Each structure stands twice: as structure tokens, then as C-alpha cells.
A protein has these predicted regions:
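Conserved phosphate-binding/catalytic region of the ribokinase-like
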Residues: 17, 34, 66-174
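Conserved beta-alpha-beta core of the PfkB/ribokinase-like small-molecule kinase fold
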Residues: 1-71, 89-90
Length: 174
């Protein structure tokens, strides 16, 4: 979601229609300040999974703590907030009270271009495959980590099976 791409509410309308048809909705955002919150807030009530980076979420809310940031978005209507934390992993906070942090994998980073998009793609795959929430986030983390091992967006991502094997064989940080 980029404010310059839609300041007329069309994104919110699209998500509302998708939800009415039974779709699961995910939203990522490109935002730089609390001034962008008005545009973002219009889509949140129609969002199942809101997945900004911690930097984007902090810029929107002015808050620093991941739990506080996530609760702000839950209060604005999302069902679940998943914050990517870079080298610190990812934080999952669902409206039902489920919350956890998944650590990042130990990798040699070559390029972080597209890591957020790779995380979101891995998350969507996990949803479609019916994984439990923690496995979904771990799979998303693995997809993002593999992306970072290559030079350029998606260079390190090979296949679903390769990503599952990476999850099983690669240690996590911390």
C-alpha cells in the first residue's frame, strides 16, 4: 500500500469486497511518517494480516515497542499484525491473544533487496498450505532469508521443498 497510489479509498473498497467474497487479505505498506496513517487506516478493518516492517510500523505509529505497535493496528481493525524485525526475526500478534517472536535464521547476507516481499510471499504460501501460525512465520522467515543469500531479489529462493529443507537444517540466531 502506497499512499501516492491511492488516496481515494479504492484500496479499502477492494479489500472490503475481497473479504465479502471470503478471501483472506494481507497488506504490506510503504509509509514514512504518522501523516500516512490516515491512508493506511482505511484498509485496516478489511485486513486479516497486516505485515509491515518494524521500521514502517514505528514510522506510522510513533511507537517503538513491537507489542505496542501491533496493538495499535489491532485497535484499528486488523485481525493479526506480523512485524518483520530484520536480523531479529518476526513478531506475530493475533487478535485472539496469540503472540510470539520467531528468530531470524543464521545466514550470510548478500543482498536484502526484496526481503520484505519474499517474507510476504512465504507467509501467503504458508496460509495456502494450511500451516499453523508459527510454521507460517518460520516459512516466511526462511523465504526471506533465502532471498537475502542471493544477489538481487529472489535470487536465493529456489523451491517450496528447498525452503522446507532450509527451515529444518539452518540454525536460527540467538
Amino acid at each position: 500500500l502506497m499512499a501516492r497510489m491511492d488516496n481515494s479509498g479504492r484500496n479499502g473498497d477492494l479489500l472490503k469486497r475481497a473479504k465479502a467474497k471470503g478471501a483472506t487479505t494481507t497488506v504490506d505498506v510503504f509509509a514514512g511518517s504518522p501523516d500516512d496513517m490516515g491512508d493506511v487506516a482505511g484498509v485496516l478493518p478489511h485486513t486479516d494480516y497486516f505485515m509491515p516492517s518494524i521500521e514502517e510500523a514505528r514510522a506510522l505509529t510513533g511507537l517503538t515497542d513491537a507489542g505496542d505497535v501491533a496493538r495499535t493496528f489491532l485497535d484499528l481493525g486488523v485481525n493479526c499484525c506480523v512485524l518483520t524485525l530484520g536480523a531479529d526475526g518476526a513478531y506475530y500478534h493475533h487478535r485472539d491473544g496469540t503472540r510470539f517472536t520467531v528468530p531470524a535464521y543464521q545466514i550470510k547476507v548478500r543482498c536484502t533487496c526484496g526481503c520484505g516481499d519474499a517474507f510476504n510471499a512465504g507467509f501467503a504460501v504458508g496460509l495456502v498450505k494450511g500451516f499453523d501460525p508459527e510454521t507460517i512465520v518460520r516459512f516466511a522467515q526462511a523465504t526471506s532469508a533465502l532471498n537475502a543469500t542471493g544477489l538481487g531479489s529472489q535470487a536465493g529462493v529456489q523451491s517450496f521443498e528447498h525452503t522446507l529443507n532450509f527451515m529444518k537444517t539452518t540454525p536460527v540466531r540467538g
